[in-house]
């Protein structure tokens, strides 16, 4: 290289430094200053990663004073360039030394980079093209936002997520039974809305005890980084340095906070209302008490928020558990105009009873009675269903009957009263759950406990609830006493653990202290590997404990958890549950069992309850088991019966006499059977069908499973890491560690931690080991990796050697990749119809396009890399021909680009018009179709077609190919 002071060069490895000036040179080194970034670099003369910047006639330059000009002529004097230029602002011709050029410069156009000899490796060009193709495919994939979460492929969850996630400003009630995954459904809906850029700002309101659960779930399952808001965090905004009070709720886009906290802090509630959120999620919404005369403060606050936030998801208990009045209150939050009166709602619900019977007949495949046919015809009055009814009641073959029943069912689902607002799945409707097997262990109460109870009773220092926890009563008398040395429950637990050496066991205690002391007992007595898990631990500590418990080899056999600490954590890989303490109400009991009894559990669940004879513990266990059957079945009526029988139950639990207790249990059991029967009769089978998605939902799960099994993502991602310079260490067991390095092509890889991260592409492994990142096309690391390539300069210009004995040596081909794209507001989601679409051309020296005859992969197999020095010479020699071919490509691209844009317009028009027409048809029979939803869609269609009509194309990258015989 020939250097001279004053010459302008750019760094090949650090493009962001700008245009440099040679400031010094000796026998071994060259010094270059980069004024734009205020940096100085010293390079070895022989290997300086620099490229000389020399503009040519017709190029546009920028002067340091800011004006632009077109190069008319170029002169070299003493190795320095002088340009005769014509200013663009006043047409004046003026001579400019290269030292006067603006310091801020970047060669982002592929032809500029090529002619300034900023040539990328051939493999970089290939990666860029593949990244563009994958980006296009992912934008248009119907699985986007559904496949990327760390969860099993559960059809009903995927169906609800897809159905709700694709709506504009969805407002729905998610009311699945416990254990069916409402949180996952909400997360998938949220993820779809975020990826589609329909929403940006999200507020999640939860009970205080569930804040960390949601924080962990959103991060671990969906890679969403929420912020936890409380008074301490918000107080920092109250005394700003500039004395202008700021709203803390606008500081973050994704926020979780406790609803009770907002209720108790009116100032914060007001700030949340002014936060301009796009989506509101409320967990445990059934706790919002309401009556026509006196709604609770919490209910009114959520009502105010739902009035100013367009999209609302309410997670709640099933309507059967809530009762009709409470169920109406949730629907009123979603659409107060539609659900304006409870009496009107009651009357409307009664109208669906005959329909429910007809649905039952359709499901049971009986012949439809005349009455049932009339009711169906009345409900579907806008269409002629007579042909379908005839097929169902005829001697037609089974397949024809199924098609007719399916079409009727589909029409009923679309027109069902609350079908668009309410989704509710039951275990009976979903099925596939394992059995729950109850083991009661009856033990003698140690004399140490009995003596402590007697003494404290005499002193009047014992409260009734404390009788459930004799070890705590014992420690009241002697805080340092080690109760676990004589408590028979501990020896029984140790024996159980030793007898189940290959099994994982979850033990739930009432409090953190007992869990910690039990861990000490297991460790000191038998050296059993165990972990503790409670609310006093940080999220990171709980994550470690959970990961330790999940490890199959060298992991903890036992996890000892407090009841609060275990909330929201699921351990489906275990099937043995020990309830060291019994919760004091059926809903909490179901939550405890629900840690194991969830979607994804493949084995029967063994539930162990060690109790002391003749104590409140064993009587409560008896009432749960014989009265409610709450251990071996889910008990949706448990809360109702507990409220009705709670006072009487407390009397029996705290009384020394057990007279009539058995009779009381029998009465409870009869009421339980009656309520169960009423719930079964009241099952809304049509709603269940709408909620579980049927065959389509199963197909959706299958499609994602097929994509999970493809190696395309793995091949692309590992190649991406290789080229960017991310270090990879294969750990075996389908996992690798990826870490940033100092030699990466980019200064930072968004989403990749400095200390590295362990990842897997295997869904089952990711479910079993929470510490692994689950890489999918939706994962931030993959999406950010694609963005790094397509939004940067990597692979924009390349030169390759084509080994082909049939072609004359030196034959020139030019491969060009254009991008067809539309500029539009995020919320329109035009990428569904026209994502940034790569259009490849392959021109010969005459300008003929050979791309249809020679595929990208077919050509790539024949190419070899070309050295930098040789490539630079080729570009210099062939520049005129290359420039001519680039001009020719601008003509070649017009027709195919216009065709792609026209196809996108047709797709947008068909898709949006079909949805608008469907909603208009439904609106006539289903009041849940909001007028504003149709208006939004119509506006969206008009604007979408206008913007697609303005779509354009640009040259993204190019590759010069020169043939050789060998």
Curated annotation (Swiss-Prot):
UniProt keyword annotations, A-Z: Activator, ATP-binding, DNA-binding, Helicase, Hydrolase, Nucleotide-binding, Transcription, Transcription regulation
One BP term from GO: regulation of DNA-templated transcription
EC number: 3.6.4.-
GO MF terms held by the record: ATP binding; DNA binding; helicase activity; hydrolase activity, acting on acid anhydrides
Sequence motif DEAH box, residues: 283-286
CDD domains with a match to the protein in the record: DEXDc_RapA, SF2_C_SNF
Positions that bind ATP: 176-183
Domain Helicase ATP-binding: residue ranges: 163-337
Keyword Nucleotide-binding applies: yes
Keyword Endoplasmic reticulum in annotation: no
Every Helicase C-terminal domain range: 489-643
Functional description taken from the UniProt entry: Transcription regulator that activates transcription by stimulating RNA polymerase (RNAP) recycling in case of stress conditions such as supercoiled DNA or high salt concentrations. Probably acts by releasing the RNAP, when it is trapped or immobilized on tightly supercoiled DNA. Does not activate transcription on linear DNA. Probably not involved in DNA repair.
Subunit description: Interacts with the RNAP. Has a higher affinity for the core RNAP than for the holoenzyme. Its ATPase activity is stimulated by binding to RNAP.
Similarity comment: family membership: Belongs to the SNF2/RAD54 helicase family. RapA subfamily.
NCBIfam families: PRK04914.1
Name of this protein: RNA polymerase-associated protein RapA
Organism whose genome encodes this protein: Histophilus somni (strain 2336) (Haemophilus somnus)
Classification of source organism: Bacteria, Pseudomonadati, Pseudomonadota, Gammaproteobacteria, Pasteurellales
UniProt gene name: rapA
């Amino acid at each position: 290289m020939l250097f001279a002071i004053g010459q302008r060069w750019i760094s090949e490895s650090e493009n962001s430094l700008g245009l440099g000036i040679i400031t010094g040179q000796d026998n071994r080194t060259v010094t270059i200053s980069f004024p734009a970034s205020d940096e100085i670099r010293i390079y070895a003369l022989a290997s300086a990663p620099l490229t000389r910047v020399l503009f040519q006639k017709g190029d546009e330059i920028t002067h340091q004073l800011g004006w632009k000009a077109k190069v008319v002529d170029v002169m070299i004097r003493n190795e320095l360039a002088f340009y005769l230029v014509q200013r663009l602002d006043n047409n004046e011709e003026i001579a400019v030394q290269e030292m006067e050029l603006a310091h801020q410069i970047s060669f982002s156009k592929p032809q500029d980079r090529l002619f300034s000899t900023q040539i990328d490796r051939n493999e970089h060009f290939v990666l860029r093209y593949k990244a563009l193709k994958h980006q296009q495919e992912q934008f248009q994939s119907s699985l986007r936002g559904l496949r990327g979460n760390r969860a099993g492929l559960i059809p009903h969850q995927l169906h609800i997520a897809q159905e709700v996630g694709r709506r504009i400003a969805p407002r729905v009630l998610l009311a699945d039974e416990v254990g069916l995954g409402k949180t996952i459904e909400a997360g998938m809906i949220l993820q779809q809305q975020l990826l589609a850029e329909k929403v940006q700002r999200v507020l999640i309101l939860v009970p205080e005890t569930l804040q960390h659960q949601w924080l962990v779930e959103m991060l671990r399952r969906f890679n969403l980084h929420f912020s936890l808001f409380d008074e301490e965090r918000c107080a920092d905004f109250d005394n700003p340095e500039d004395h202008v009070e700021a709203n803390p709720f606008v500081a973050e886009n994704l926020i979780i906070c406790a609803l009770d906290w907002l209720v108790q802090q009116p100032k914060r509630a007001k700030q949340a209302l002014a936060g301009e959120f796009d989506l509101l999620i409320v967990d445990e919404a059934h706790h919002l008490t309401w009556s026509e005369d006196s709604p609770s403060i919490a209910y009114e606050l959520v009502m105010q928020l739902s009035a100013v936030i367009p999209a609302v998801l309410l997670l709640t208990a099933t309507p059967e558990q809530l009762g009709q009045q409470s169920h109406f209150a949730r629907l009123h939050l979603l659409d107060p105009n539609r659900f304006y009166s409870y009496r009107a709602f009651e009357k409307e619900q009664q109208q669906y009873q005959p329909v429910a019977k007809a649905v039952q007949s359709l499901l049971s495949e009986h012949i439809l009675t005349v009455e049932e046919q009339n009711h169906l015809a009345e409900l579907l009055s806008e269409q002629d269903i007579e042909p379908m009814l005839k097929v169902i009641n005829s001697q037609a073959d089974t397949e024809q009957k199924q098609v007719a029943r399916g079409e009727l069912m589909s029409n009923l689902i679309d027109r069902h009263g609350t079908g668009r607002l309410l989704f509710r799945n039951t275990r009976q409707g979903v099925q596939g759950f394992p059995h729950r097997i109850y083991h009661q262990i009856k033990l003698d109460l140690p004399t140490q406990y009995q003596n402590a109870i007697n003494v404290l009773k005499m002193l009047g220092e014992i409260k009734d609830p404390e009788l459930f926890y004799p070890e705590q009563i014992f420690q009241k008398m002697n805080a340092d006493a080690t109760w676990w040395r004589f408590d028979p429950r501990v020896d029984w637990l140790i024996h159980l653990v030793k007898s189940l050496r290959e099994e994982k066991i979850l033990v739930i205690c009432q409090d953190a202290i007992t869990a910690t002391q039990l861990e000490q007992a297991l460790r000191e007595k038998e050296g059993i590997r165990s972990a503790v898990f409670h609310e006093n631990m940080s999220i990171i500590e709980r994550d470690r404990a959970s990961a330790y418990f999940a490890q199959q080899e060298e992991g903890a056999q036992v996890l000892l958890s407090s009841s609060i600490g275990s909330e929201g954590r699921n351990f489906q890989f275990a099937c043995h549950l020990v309830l060291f303490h019994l919760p004091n109400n059926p809903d909490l009991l179901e939550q405890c069992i629900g840690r194991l009894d969830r979607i994804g559990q493949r084995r029967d669940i063994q539930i162990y309850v060690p109790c002391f004879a003749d104590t409140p513990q064993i009587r409560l266990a008896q009432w749960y088991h014989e009265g409610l059957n709450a251990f071996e079945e889910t008990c949706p009526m448990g809360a109702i019966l507990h409220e009705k029988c709670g006072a009487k139950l407390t009397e029996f639990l705290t009384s020394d006499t057990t007279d009539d207790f058995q009779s009381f249990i029998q009465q409870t059991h009869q009421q339980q059977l009656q309520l169960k029967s009423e719930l079964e009769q009241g099952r809304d089978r049509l709603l269940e069908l709408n909620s579980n998605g049927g065959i389509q939902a199963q197909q959706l799960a299958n499609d994602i499973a097929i994509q999970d099994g493809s190696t395309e993502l793995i091949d692309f991602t590992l190649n991406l890491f290789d080229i960017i310079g991310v270090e990879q260490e294969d750990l075996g067991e389908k996992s690798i560690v990826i870490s940033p390095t100092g030699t990466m092509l980019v200064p930072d890889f968004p989403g990749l931690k400095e200390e590295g991260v362990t990842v897997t592409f295997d869904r089952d492994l990711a479910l079993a080991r929470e510490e692994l990142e689950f890489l999918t096309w939706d994962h931030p690391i993959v999406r950010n990796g694609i963005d790094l390539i397509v939004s940067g300069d990597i692979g924009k210009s390349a030169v390759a050697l084509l080994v082909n004995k049939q072609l004359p040596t030196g034959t020139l081909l030019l491969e060009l990749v254009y991008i067809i794209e539309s500029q539009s507001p995020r919320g329109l989601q035009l990428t569904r119809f026209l994502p940034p679409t790569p259009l490849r051309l392959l021109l010969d020296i005459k300008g003929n396009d050979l791309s249809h005859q020679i595929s990208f992969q077919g050509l790539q197999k024949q190419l070899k890399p070309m050295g930098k020095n040789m490539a630079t010479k080729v570009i210099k020699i062939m520049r005129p021909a290359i420039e001519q071919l680039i001009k020719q490509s601008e003509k070649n691209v017009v027709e195919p680009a216009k065709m792609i844009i026209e196809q996108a317009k047709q797709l947008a028009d068909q898709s949006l018009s079909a949805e608008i027409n469907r909603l208009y048809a439904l609106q006539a029979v289903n009041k849940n179709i909001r007028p504003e939803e149709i208006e939004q869609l119509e506006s969206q269609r008009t604007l979408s077609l206008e913007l697609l009509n303005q779509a354009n194309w640009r040259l993204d990258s190019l590759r010069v190919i020169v043939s050789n015989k060998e």
